[in-house]
Structures are given as structure tokens and as C-alpha cells.
Regions:
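Glycine-rich Rossmann-fold phosphate-binding loop(s) that bind the pyrophosphate
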Residues: 11-12
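Aromatic pocket-lining residues of Rossmann-like dinucleotide-binding sites
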Residues: 22
Length: 186
């Protein structure tokens, strides 16, 4: 990664632990549309209890980190314009289901619209929300193209990475899973 600035879209059970871990090595902007959630995080309070207070406070920064080499930290915001300098976007919004157990894609579509507004040539978008096979290409990519005016696999790139955590599981955290993976696959 050449001067990455990572955006995490959705700071819930999946997004916040990932943002905290990445912020130990990279500049990270954590975006959540809920102002109350962001305000609590800015104080170092995680109401989901997924991230320990001391670990969260170690990486929090009160200002949006710049792309200066070596700068790290997590800036939490509910202002979409704070995503403008990011070049990697990881979408971790929830995908609830309706009463018939069909996925409600509204959060995913809204997140794709937000990302599309700030997408630039060469950027990478990774979806980590739980979705059915083909959803990324069928639902998300067209929104990114329409909003950004860019062309998928030509101007920007998209990937899918399934969730790597089990909310509430303090033993199998993102950091522990990555550590074990790197030890097994150097």
C-alpha cells in the first residue's frame, strides 16, 4: 500500500474492532451515520463492548489524519466529507433481514452511495457486510459507478471479505485471527 488512508464505513461490532486494529499502523477514518455513536467513540466509549477502552483511546485522534507517511490513528466522524482523502474503503454496515428473512440492502446501498461520492481513480472498496453471492457486483458496484462516474475494474476496484469476527467473542478477535493466520501463512 502506497500511502494508504483507510475509511471504515460503519463502526459497529465488525467495523470498530477492524478500525482500531488498522489504526495502529495506518491513518483511519471511521465513519458512522449515527452522531451519538460517533460522539461516544470520540470520548473513547464503545457501547458494544467489542473494543477495550484503553485500546480504543490509544489510537483515537481528535483530527482527521493526513496522508503523511508514518501517521497513524483513528478519527471517528459522522461527516461524510471527512472521507474525501481516503483511498481504501471498507464497508462494514449491517444487513438486517425482513420478516421473511430476506436481506434488507438499504444500509449497504446507502453506504455505497456515500463511498461513491468520494471514490477516485485507483481507489479500492472492500465489502465486509454479510451478503448473498453476487450482491456486491449486482447491487453495490452499479451504485459506485453511477455516483462516482468511474468505471469498475478500470478506474476503481472492489473486493469482498467475509466477516472475521463473532460479535461478543473476546477470544477470537480480529487481532487474534490475523495473528494466527500470519503465523500459519507467512
Amino acid at each position: 500500500m502506497n500511502h494508504p488512508k483507510i475509511a471504515i464505513i460503519g463502526l459497529g461490532y465488525v467495523g470498530l474492532p477492524l478500525a482500531r486494529l488498522l489504526a495502529t499502523r495506518y491513518p483511519v477514518v471511521g465513519y458512522d451515520k449515527k452522531a451519538s455513536r460517533v460522539e461516544a467513540l470520540q470520548r473513547g466509549e464503545d457501547t458494544t463492548l467489542e473494543v477495550e477502552t484503553n485500546l480504543l483511546r490509544e489510537v483515537l485522534t481528535p483530527t482527521n489524519p493526513t496522508l503523511e507517511q508514518g501517521q497513524t490513528g483513528l478519527f471517528c466522524t459522522h461527516t461524510p466529507d471527512d472521507l474525501a482523502q481516503c483511498n481504501y474503503f471498507i464497508v462494514t454496515v449491517p444487513t438486517p433481514v425482513d420478516k421473511h428473512h430476506r436481506p434488507l440492502l438499504t444500509p449497504l446501498q446507502s453506504a455505497s452511495e456515500v463511498v461513491g461520492k468520494y471514490l477516485k481513480a485507483g481507489d479500492i472498496v472492500i465489502y465486509e457486510s454479510t451478503v448473498y453471492p453476487g450482491c456486491t457486483e449486482e447491487e453495490c458496484v452499479p451504485i459506485l459507478e453511477q455516483v462516482s462516474g468511474l468505471k469498475f475494474n478500470q478506474d476503481f476496484f472492489v473486493g469482498y471479505s467475509p466477516e472475521r469476527i463473532n460479535p461478543g467473542d473476546k477470544l477470537h478477535t480480529v487481532a487474534q485471527i490475523l495473528k494466527n493466520h500470519l503465523r500459519l501463512h507467512p
